[in-house]
Amino acid sequence: MTRIPKRTLVFGVLCLLFIFALFLRASTAIIVEDLMIDLAAPAAALGLMSSGFFYAYAAAQIPVGMLSDRIGVRFTVFGFGLLGVAGALLFAFSQGIGMATWARILTGAGTAGIWIPALKYLSTEYRPEEFATLTSIINAIGCLGLLFSTYPMAVMVELIGWRYSFAVPAIILLIFTILAWFLMKPRPAQAIKAGEEIADTQTGDQEAAVTASGIAGKQFWKYSYFWPFAIWAFLVYGVLFSFTGLWGASYLQDSFNISREAAGTHLMFVSIGMICGGLFWGILSDRYFKARRPVLFIGTIGMLLTWATLVSFTIYPGPLLTSLLYFAIGIFSVTFLINLGCAKELFPVEIAGTAMGTVNAGMFVGVAVFQGVTGYLLDFFLENQSSLFAFRAIFILYTVCIAVALLMVFFMPESFPGHIKKPASL
């Protein structure tokens, strides 16, 4: 019998942990109606509760990165994993919106300690040429968590209730967190060797970036071409997860009076679109366009047309068209992965990680802001208008924000390795 390498087992467990991290991030969307009733919470309060997850996630990014470097992946994943478990269990048994908000904050901070440490583990345990492929694999597998938070979550809520639908995954997350602790045994010599290989490769790959921009050792935020990528990420990711992470099912249930299961099925197509798009856009950018900006342009145009179409609906468009539009939201919005990579490609290795981490944190701040604003606007419009009118007004806001993101694309320099162009002005 062939023995499975320990690093492969660890990789598998990290993938499973990431599935549960994304599940816990998005699973509140399917239980909005339950939360409003059980917690006696208006839409604005739910928006603030949900945004707490993303503020905490964003705030934890830098500490997680530092801890992964200083105390190692094993301790970081274990500590933050336990925090995420505690948050999920607290949320499952929350008796009011205040307790639920603190629970989501704990869950956000805890699940923030999985993605970055996973990348750190890949960079030290695998060869440099394997890194990009494995990153794509763990991201695609993780998106299964988004898929499970839709129709499967709706079915589970109907069977065991929303509280146990959070408690059960929390227990499973605890099991995998403990398993990761026992599987990840320090191997300093190998880690150092692999880490040196990664550093050498990154230095060679980004030499063009240093030459083109002339910013080695300087603060990235002082350069104007950083901000179009950051603003684009804030707007696109904020709109994406504000809708799919909280309001995507409620829109269908309240506006068109369809069942929770049907709404969950439609929401599932966002996850399917993200899984397909995560692989499609990378191949299109690397092998065919050999450029990043055209992919971002196509993706943003697609988002703009999708949201504009949703604004136009005054009646339920039917299951087929609704599923196609939700799929479009996923496949076009997942170009945020390309945008995030641009921050790494534009800057020298000394500051590329910090630049990428800042863009990543901004993405989650965007979600927190948009979820809060969306909840407030829903309460405002629902005082005198129908749910459909309220959501159409919100979709107009989303469309305008995506239009601003499209404008940002025109200010982005091309960052594809070997084709980096210096912006017109600094």
Regions flagged by a language model, labelled:
Residues 138-191:
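Helix-loop-helix hairpin linking two adjacent transmembrane segments in secondary transporters
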Residues 82-95, 301-315:
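C-terminal ends and interior cores of transmembrane alpha-helices
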Residues 103-144:
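Cytoplasmic helix-loop-helix junction between adjacent transmembrane helices
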Residues 1-3, 188-230, 425-426:
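Juxtamembrane intracellular "pre-TM" segments in multi-pass secondary transporters
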Residues 59-98:
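Conserved MFS/SLC helix-loop-helix module at the cytosolic interface between two early adjacent transmembrane helices
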Residues 87, 98-106, 320-328:
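Paired small-residue
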Residues 28-30, 223-281, 367-375:
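Extracytoplasmic gate region of multi-pass secondary transporters
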Residues 70-80, 286-301:
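Cytoplasmic membrane-interface "Motif A"-like loop-to-helix N-cap segments
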